[in-house]
């Protein structure tokens, strides 16, 4: 909880990336949100599943499903809304990479109906360099206002599928702002020198129809029916190991924090 301010507090629901928790990164963002007057609830999707909190999914990017993470987030939202210290009308999510990608599901009413249950609507979302590899073809959006920040040179989570999904959400009536951080790699807000290494990437733009469960990979044209065929071959060509680059500058971090601060002010009237 923040050192100053009045109850009930606005809340940032902090969503970890696939890299797990790092005090040098996640801890600093949490302190920053506290200084802005926000209570923080961060979701640890790893420990209870016997996974390393520090290591997350690792470079193999495996061990836990998106649906499991989304279910955890909805549970956290319900918990926060039931706490009298928290203002249920002023809750936002924040996450980078996988933590941002999970928010793509939160923007869809279909996922909310499948995994969320009652009373999980919140005020907004902030996604940095999100993963947008699996989306609803024709989404019916939820009401939260989203800020999506994309790295111009992100070679881990490609910006294009996110722009495509954001456009479809906007056409369906969603309140979503998309901005590109010039020259930015993946995780540009690390405030660490850029470095490259190999990791599993999901360079996919897979869209599905919830009514029929027909899905297609937009990039290579592969089509499947999830109910009949399973999920396998639609992913075959777009999930692979590749060179990724992470890191950025203090200037990029400062710009990002100011943009996040403005979105919070606009969304919550603070």
Where do the model's predicted regions map?
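Residues at the C-terminal ends
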Residues: 34-35, 141, 171
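C-terminal catalytic histidine-bearing segment of alpha/beta-hydrolase fold enzymes
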Residues: 175-270
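Short beta-strand-to-loop junctions in surface cap/lid or active-site-entrance loops
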Residues: 1-7
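Serine-hydrolase catalytic machinery in alpha/beta-hydrolase-like enzymes
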Residues: 11-82, 241-242
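Conserved loop-alpha-helix segment in the C-terminal half of the alpha/beta-hydrolase fold
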Residues: 162-173
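Primarily recognizes the serine-hydrolase "nucleophile elbow" in alpha/beta-hydrolase
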Residues: 21-25, 65-142, 155, 160
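Short aromatic-enriched loop/helix-cap "lid" or pocket-rim segments at secondary-structure transitions
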Residues: 53-55, 139, 189-195
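Short beta-strand/loop motif that positions the catalytic acidic residue
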Residues: 148-150
């Amino acid at each position: 909880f923040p050192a100053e301010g009045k109850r009930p507090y606005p809340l940032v629901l902090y969503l970890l990336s696939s890299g797990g928790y790092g005090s040098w990164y996640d801890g600093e963002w949490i302190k920053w949100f506290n200084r802005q007057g926000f209570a923080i609830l961060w979701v640890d999707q790893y420990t209870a599943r016997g996974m390393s909190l520090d290591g997350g999914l690792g470079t193999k990017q495996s061990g836990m499903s998106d649906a499991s993470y989304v279910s955890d987030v909805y549970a956290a939202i319900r918990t926060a809304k039931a706490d009298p210290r928290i203002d249920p009308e002023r809750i936002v999510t924040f996450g980078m990479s996988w933590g941002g990608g999970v928010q793509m599901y939160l923007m869809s009413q279909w996922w909310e109906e499948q995994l969320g249950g009652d009373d999980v609507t919140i005020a907004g979302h902030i996604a940095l360099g999100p993963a947008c590899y699996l989306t609803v073809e024709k989404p019916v959006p939820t009401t939260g206002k989203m800020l999506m920040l994309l790295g111009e040179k992100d070679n881990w989570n490609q910006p294009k599928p996110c722009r495509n999904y954001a456009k479809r959400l906007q056409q369906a009536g969603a309140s979503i702002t998309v901005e590109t951080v010039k020259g930015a790699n993946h995780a540009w807000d690390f405030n660490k020198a850029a470095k490259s290494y190999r990791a599993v990437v999901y360079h996919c733009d897979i869209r599905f129809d919830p009514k029929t469960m027909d899905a297609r990979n937009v990039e290579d044209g592969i089509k499947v029916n999830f109910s009949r065929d399973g999920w396998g071959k639609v992913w075959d060509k777009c999930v692979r190991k590749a060179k990724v680059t992470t890191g950025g500058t203090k200037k990029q971090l400062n710009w990002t924090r100011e943009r996040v601060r403005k979105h919070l002010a606009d969304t919550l009237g603070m």
